[in-house]
A protein has these predicted regions:
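C-terminal helical cap(s) of enzyme catalytic domains, especially alpha/beta-barrels
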Residues: 47, 106-110, 163-182
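Short, electropositive alpha-helical surface patch
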Residues: 1-10, 85-95, 144-158
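Glycine-rich phosphate-binding active-site loops on the catalytic face of alpha/beta enzymes
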Residues: 35-42, 93-105, 149-169
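Active-site beta->alpha loop and helix N-cap motifs at the rims of alpha/beta catalytic domains
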Residues: 11-52
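Hydrophobic faces of well-ordered beta-strands that scaffold small-molecule active sites
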Residues: 9-15, 33-35, 72-74, 94-96, ...
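Catalytic cores of alpha/beta
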Residues: 19-28, 79-89, 133, 137-151
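Alpha-helix-loop-beta-strand connector modules within alpha/beta enzyme cores
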Residues: 1-19, 51-73, 109-133, 176-181
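Histidine/lysine/aspartate-rich catalytic loop segments that bind and position anionic ligands
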Residues: 40, 71-127
Length: 182
């Protein structure tokens, strides 16, 4: 709450679709929320929120956020079924889970995972969704990730904070921004 009160930038809250988190977000009033899996049962094979299986719960939370003027993103796998359901719900954004791509970066499956992300971004864009991406993005794979079409925002945390431990947060952010926008 202290961070929310003193912030000078946007605050994005990653949260599960629970009553407690919904109430917390409605009190906190962040700029945006990203709905993520709450437990192992809600995780699809690659790790995104299964909005098809949990559409009623996701719809309730999304509707509550919309009514409060809080933008909502759904953290999903780049799977057509998940994207199509996301478009039917009232969240204006999706965050495509890039973890499978990041995990396959040095493996044979990298190209196929990248193709999935590109196809997912295109499908989401055509469906009228704002496209974000995140999970496992780092200083090496960003050069390819940044070429995914229709990306509005990338959510990168771990690699920036890890680099900041040795060179400071200013250098870590500056370097990532240079790699994102050469």
């Amino acid at each position: 709450r202290l961070l929310a009160a003193s912030r000078s930038t946007r605050l994005n809250l990653e949260m599960a679709c629970t009553l407690a988190m919904t109430e917390f977000a409605l009190k906190l009033k962040p700029h945006s929320v990203c709905l993520v899996p709450e437990s192992r049962e809600e995780i699809t094979t690659e790790g995104g929120l299964d909005v098809v299986k949990h559409r009623d719960k996701v719809a309730r939370v999304t509707d509550a956020m919309n009514a409060a003027g809080i933008k909502t993103s759904l953290f999903i796998d780049p799977d057509p079924e998940q994207i199509e359901m996301s478009a039917r719900l009232t969240a204006p954004w999706v965050e495509l889970h890039t973890g499978a791509y990041a995990n396959a970066y040095y493996a044979a499956g990298r190209a196929a995972e990248f193709v999935r992300l590109v196809a997912g971004a295109r499908l989401a864009h055509v469906a009228g969704l704002v496209v974000n991406a995140g999970h496992g993005i780092n200083y090496i794979n960003i050069t390819e990730v940044r070429t995914i079409p229709h990306l509005h925002e990338l959510n990168i945390g771990h690699s920036i904070i890890s680099r900041a431990l040795s060179g400071g947060i200013d250098e870590a952010v500056r370097t990532m921004k240079q790699l994102m926008n050469p």
